[in-house]
Amino acid sequence: MAFNKYQIIKGAVSYELANFIFNYFLLKRDAVKWMYDNNITYDTGMLGTWTDDQIPNTYSHYADPVMETLLMKVLPVMAQETGLQLVPTYSYARIYKNGDALHRHKDRPSCEISTTVN
């Protein structure tokens, strides 16, 4: 574990995979925004939302299937880097826009060990 309580692990996710996921999430955000703008009812649990209290008006999604798959893919890397037997709990994804800032906050206990893909 790193001194600052975080560690950068380069190459844990390939550029190609990260780019695929980024473009997937942009496309999903745009499709959901179109539905929202055209008053088409949709399930925010399945498609995401803009109502996150930490960064309002920014698209986010809890437990997106692609992000859940990514969670399972990086699990062995995280376990090796931490030396811990880890249990995956959940994924959460957000697309930041200019001006967004995620301020210092305290996550729930299930986030004791977490991964950020940037």
Tell me what each language-model feature is.
Residues M1-T82:
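Non-heme Fe(II)/2-oxoglutarate
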